[in-house]
């Protein structure tokens, strides 16, 4: 337990976890609002796919940058203050996106969103670490990861459905309303707790020391490669579904993201399994399942493509449900900074994953996108095997 105090009563913990999850849903919904809209943005602004993808890359890169600041800020100022303040401020650029007059203006506003989103995404797990005993932490983190999946699902599906009938600007208005509701819920229901105990410079120094820890570096590498692989598939999926032989409409493309529902189900299960099975083994299992899903998407059938996406989601969120709690438990100090670094590497991977595969798409089509995703998953598996395992287990494996 941290200095935040004892674990809250069950009723309070339930309400607080609900508010934490609601804020997480709002933050992730804002992050992914443009993903199903890329063909629509390409048509309106006359952009090739890789350029339209900057509306995703900009927010993801800004999240990576913002994550470096959010963790130490939460260590110094308090988790609740950073989360509620960030989510409240996020309403402003989200509303402004609905009024953007050019694509560069939209990209700049998306970057502003990205700087604020880590105030929730990079701090939520650290807040859970302050308020839950170790035996309950992985389950709580699983709930937060499930909320992130729900937010991604809401952002993608709702924005596509709204845009099809009311235009892409209306999707940002909906996102702003969801964000405001999340900020209010967090402000009312989260106990303050976890009073700041480290000055800014001390918190930043603690975060930087994590970069010398082999096992934490393994967790950061896993985060980078995992999200690269995942966002590569889902960023360029709309182009594949809009092209022959499928030729799907924007709302039909958005409905393909309903496979995210599987992530909502699997994340808490993976968190509970990690209390009985070594997290490193479950991470590898998740990566293997993800690779299988990506391979299946290469089939020419729409049904098999959707099945592959479903398998990919199950594998991705099996591994992702374990990564943040692994980092939180491995870090010996500045846990907010450790979680922030995990998110920073995660979104740096997402930045490259939302842009680089666009070049592969232009040259090799979907096979190029799937190939880059599979390479990233292989690199993630190597990081788990050689960096994440405890020292004794690693020596045993090398001796064998």
Q: Where do the PLM segments sit?
A:
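Helix-loop-helix hairpin linking two adjacent transmembrane segments in secondary transporters
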Residues: 105, 134-135, 139-188
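Cytoplasmic helix-loop-helix junction between adjacent transmembrane helices
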Residues: 109-148
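C-terminal membrane-cytosol helix-exit motif in multi-pass small-molecule transporters
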Residues: 176-196, 383-388
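Helix-breaking motifs and short loop linkers at transmembrane-helix boundaries and internal kinks
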Residues: 46, 78, 99-105, 133, ...
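Helix-to-loop junctions at the C-terminal end of transmembrane segments
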Residues: 67-78, 265-278, 361
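Conserved MFS/SLC helix-loop-helix module at the cytosolic interface between two early adjacent transmembrane helices
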Residues: 65-104
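C-terminal transmembrane helical hairpin of 12-TM major facilitator-type secondary transporters
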Residues: 280-323
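Juxtamembrane intracellular "pre-TM" segments in multi-pass secondary transporters
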Residues: 3-11, 190-220
């Amino acid at each position: 337990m941290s200095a935040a105090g004892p674990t809250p009563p069950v009723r309070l913990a339930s309400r607080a976890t609900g508010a934490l999850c609601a804020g997480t849903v709002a933050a992730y919904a804002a992050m992914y609002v443009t993903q199903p809209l890329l063909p629509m943005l390409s048509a309106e602004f006359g952009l090739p796919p890789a350029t339209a993808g900057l509306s995703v890359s900009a927010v993801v890169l800004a999240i990576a940058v913002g994550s470096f600041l959010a963790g130490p800020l939460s260590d110094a100022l308090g988790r609740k203050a950073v989360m509620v303040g960030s989510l409240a401020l996020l309403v402003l650029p989200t509303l402004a996106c609905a009024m953007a007059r050019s694509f560069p203006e939209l990209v700049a506003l998306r970057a502003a969103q990205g700087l604020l989103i880590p105030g929730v995404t990079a701090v939520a797990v650290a807040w859970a670490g302050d308020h839950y005993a170790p035996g309950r932490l992985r389950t709580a983190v699983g709930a937060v990861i499930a909320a992130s999946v729900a937010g991604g699902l809401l952002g993608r599906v709702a924005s596509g459905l709204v845009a099809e009938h009311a235009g892409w600007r209306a999707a940002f208005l909906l996102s702003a309303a969801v964000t405001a509701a999340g900020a209010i819920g967090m402000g009312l229901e989260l106990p303050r707790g976890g009073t700041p105990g480290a000055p800014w410079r001390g918190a930043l120094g603690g975060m930087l020391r994590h970069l010398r820890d082999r096992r934490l570096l393994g967790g950061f590498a896993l985060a980078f490669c995992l999200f690269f692989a995942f966002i590569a598939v889902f960023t360029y999926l709309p182009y594949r579904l809009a092209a022959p032989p499928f030729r799907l409409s924007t709302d039909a493309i958005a409905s393909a993201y309903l496979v995210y529902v599987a992530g909502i189900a699997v994340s808490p299960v993976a968190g509970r399994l990690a209390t009985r099975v070594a997290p490193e083994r479950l991470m590898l299992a998740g990566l293997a399942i993800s690779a299988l899903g990506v391979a299946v998407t290469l089939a020419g059938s729409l049904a098999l493509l959707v099945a592959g996406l479903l398998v990919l989601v199950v594998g991705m969120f099996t591994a992702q449900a374990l990564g943040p709690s692994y980092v939180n438990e491995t870090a010996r100090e500045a846990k907010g900074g450790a979680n922030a670094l995990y998110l920073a590497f995660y979104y740096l991977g997402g930045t490259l994953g939302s842009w680089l595969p666009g070049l592969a798409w232009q040259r090799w089509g979907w096979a190029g996108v799937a190939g880059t995703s599979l390479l990233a998953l292989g690199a993630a598996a190597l990081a788990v095997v050689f960096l994440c395992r405890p020292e004794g287990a690693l020596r045993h494996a090398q001796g064998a």
